[in-house]
Swiss-Prot record:
InterPro entries: YspA. It comes from Bacillus cereus (strain AH820). Belongs to the UPF0398 family. Disulfide bonds: none annotated. It comes from the Bacteria. This is UPF0398 protein BCAH820_1652. NCBIfam families: PRK13660.1 (NF010181). Coiled coil: none annotated.
Amino acid sequence: MKVIAVTGYKPFELGIFKNDHPGVECIKKALRRKLTAFVEDGLEWVIISGQLGVELWTAEVVFEIQVEYPDLKLAVFTPFLEQEEGWKEDNREYYEFILSQADHVDSITKRKYESPEQFKLKNQFFIEKSDALLAVYDEEKPGSPKYIVEAAKKKGEIENYHSYFILFSDLQDIIEEEQWNNAE
């Protein structure tokens, strides 16, 4: 596997409204573990669409991993131009920082937002251009990643395409591990 697409919930879907929420570090730790293992097995590129939440936290994790594995690259393919338009200023600044550090940035449709069809095109692009999908997603709590997860599963039924998941139970295990380590 050379290219993995990463996605997951938006912050509000997780009840997270600030990047310093303790849940963010837990999610980043889970992402770090998965991505580091993939890098050690030959992963070269991580691709995200730049949406707030899991995707931008993934970018931060990639930047951390690049210290030890500088050949790992991050690409941000936005579904449309100026997707950050209308975001709060601190979220725009955070997003612009991530874009400034990414190895590749492009827009899939090369137009500003016109219709939900652009999200469908984004999902198709990600599944076509990647070897696997990693999603912070639990089918017990459907949310915005549902459609790309379904597309990945369909591709996996007909080709060698893998979907990997970080479930709520995985995050709970990390929380319990942290509590155990802090109690010692």
